A protein has these predicted regions:
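Histidine-anchored nucleotide/phosphate-binding helix
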Residues: 56
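Divalent-metal-activated hydrolytic enzyme cores
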Residues: 1-39, 45-47, 53, 62-63, ...
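N-terminal, polar/Ser/Thr-rich
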Residues: 99-101
Length: 238
């Protein structure tokens, strides 16, 4: 099938979302991330196609805290981050926070990357739509907004993703990979700024959520790391 060929070519290390989370669970279990002592926070795009990932996370670590906005960039601000950290289960020693950041991309039945054929629609649409709009704005400039409206999330997404590279990405695939790296960086910037490691162990996992037609979603790992009480980031391999 064309979409499977495209997946294997563009994302050779991708695995199903279930397989990915099983690997994550096996990886963090020796670090003390038992279900009863852990709290999950998830940053995915608001697109309805992304929501199944939250359900899968909930099966392993209970209902997660929602961090995400357009492009899966955390959009809750410092106040929201403080709220998330305050929900981490109390443990006799230290809390355990597991964070996921997943920009997403689609592959349509013809194997075209960056498009999805959505439920009850006859034509494919961009996935991620926000990232497609960002790519267009990088090439052609932002359109002026109607008075009374704002686009703060899109502007912030552009600024943070733009900081990842001096080169204009050629396509949505390249831009999505830059976005995943940007999401990972932003996670650690916020967690470091709040000194979260002083009270809890932290594991952050970032990747790309991939939607296939009539198939389970896949995850392409991008970055994974753990930080304990010493405040030192240690890379993990999923």
């Amino acid at each position: 099938m064309l979409h499977i060929e495209a997946l294997n070519l563009a994302f050779p290390q991708a695995v199903s979302s279930e397989q990915y989370l099983a690997r994550v669970a096996k990886l963090v279990s020796p670090l003390g991330f038992a279900r009863e002592h852990s709290f999950a926070a998830v940053s995915v795009c608001r697109d309805e196609l992304t929501q199944s990932f939250l359900d899968l996370v909930a099966r392993r670590w209970d209902q997660p805290f929602s961090l995400g906005g357009l492009g899966a960039l955390p959009s809750l601000g410092r106040t929201g981050w403080r709220a998330a950290l305050s929900h981490v289960p109390q443990d006799p020693d230290r809390g355990h926070l597991i964070v996921f950041g997943m920009p997403h991309i689609g592959i349509d039945p013809e194997g075209n990357i960056g498009q999805s054929l959505r439920r009850h629609q006859n034509e494919v649409t961009p996935t991620c739509g926000a990232m497609a709009a960002l790519l267009s704005s990088l090439r052609n400039g932002f359109e002026p907004l109607t008075p009374g409206l704002d686009d703060h999330e899109a502007e912030r997404l552009r600024r943070i993703v733009d900081s990842q590279s001096d080169q204009l990405p050629d396509n949505l695939l390249e831009l999505t990979k830059l976005a995943a790296a940007a999401v990972n960086d932003e996670m650690w910037v916020e967690l470091d700024a709040l000194g979260a490691y002083k009270e809890m162990d932290i594991a952050v996992f970032c990747g790309i959520q991939i939607h296939l037609p009539d198939e389970v979603d896949f995850i392409y790992p991008v970055a994974s790391a753990f930080m304990g009480s010493d405040g030192i980031t240690k890379a993990l391999v999923v």
